[in-house]
Amino acid sequence: MQAASNPYQQYLQNAVLTADPGRLTLMLYTGAVKFIRQASDCLAARDIPGAHRANLRAQDIIVYLLETVNREMEVGKNLSALYDYMYRRLVEANVKKDPAILEEVAGLVEDLAGTWEQALKLKGQQAAGG
């Protein structure tokens, strides 16, 4: 892994390398939303190559989530189907240059992130005995 060139990059790299799986999933959701919003902003600015790059980065995150989900449990099967849907919609948004589709997917990922964040808080409270 290449050394980070500035303090912010070093901080982010350290945060990712030391995050537990639950926190890492939340970071992935946050990153996906960031890139989806970036793609939408690029479309609004008529920066088609920028929108394409940002959309591909969001797709990469969704594919990673799809590949790592545990499909042995019912919730994993449901998440897998949702990730697959989001991926297909991102591809469609990229082809059609449609910001409405990007907004739809961003909303889905934000909902997942909110739910995941609540689950992490509950897990933390249970671990603390509360």
Residue ranges of model-derived segments:
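C-terminal-biased regions
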Residues: M1-G130
